[in-house]
């Protein structure tokens, strides 16, 4: 879950409607069970000029650990490259760092706190590696 127990409004982000933003979803029997959103957004501490931020990745608890998030990212990677970007970054929750490493992300720096959300790590994936 993205923000379990929080209003739906907390899952809406600035940039959701931008032209270069795209949203992916996995459906099982017509029900949306996993989502990922990609934003054309440069991180201030990463030099690569063109970047996408992965934000809002979530899977319903009953559908976690079935490869849905990995599948969404495998769809996202070529779309990002098609938009002439070769780097994706995210602020990974501490408990999700292992997942991101499995799909090729690398950690940068130290864990940091996002208020009300806990410890996170800046992670990047270079699509040309």
Map each language-model feature to its residues.
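Conserved beta-strand in the GNAT
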Residues: 25, 31-42, 53-58
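Conserved active-site tyrosine of GNAT-family acetyltransferases
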Residues: 100, 105
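Conserved GNAT acetyl-CoA-binding A-motif
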Residues: 73, 80-92
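Short hydrophobic/aromatic beta-strand element in the GNAT-like acyltransferase core
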Residues: 10, 21-25, 35, 56, ...
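A conserved beta-turn-beta hairpin within the catalytic core of GNAT-like acetyltransferases
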Residues: 41-54, 64, 117
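Conserved acetyl-CoA-binding loop-helix of GNAT-fold acetyltransferases
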Residues: 59, 65-78
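Short amphipathic alpha-helix that is part of the acyltransferase structural core
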Residues: 1-14, 18-32, 129
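Conserved catalytic-core motifs of GNAT/GCN5-like acyltransferases
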Residues: 89-91, 106-122
């Amino acid at each position: 879950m993205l923000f379990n127990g929080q209003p739906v409004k907390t899952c809406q982000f600035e940039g959701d409607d931008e032209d270069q933003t795209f949203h992916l979803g996995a459906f099982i029997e017509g029900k949306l069970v996993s989502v990922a959103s990609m934003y054309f957004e440069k991180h201030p501490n990463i030099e690569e000029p063109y970047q996408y931020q992965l934000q809002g990745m979530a899977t319903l608890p009953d559908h976690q650990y079935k490869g849905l998030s990995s599948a969404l990212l495998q769809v996202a990677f070529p779309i990002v490259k098609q938009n002439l970007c070769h780097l994706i970054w995210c602020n990974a929750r501490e408990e999700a760092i292992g997942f991101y490493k499995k799909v090729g992300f690398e950690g940068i720096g130290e864990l940091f706190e996002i208020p009300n959300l806990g410890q996170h790590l800046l992670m990047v994936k270079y699509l040309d590696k």
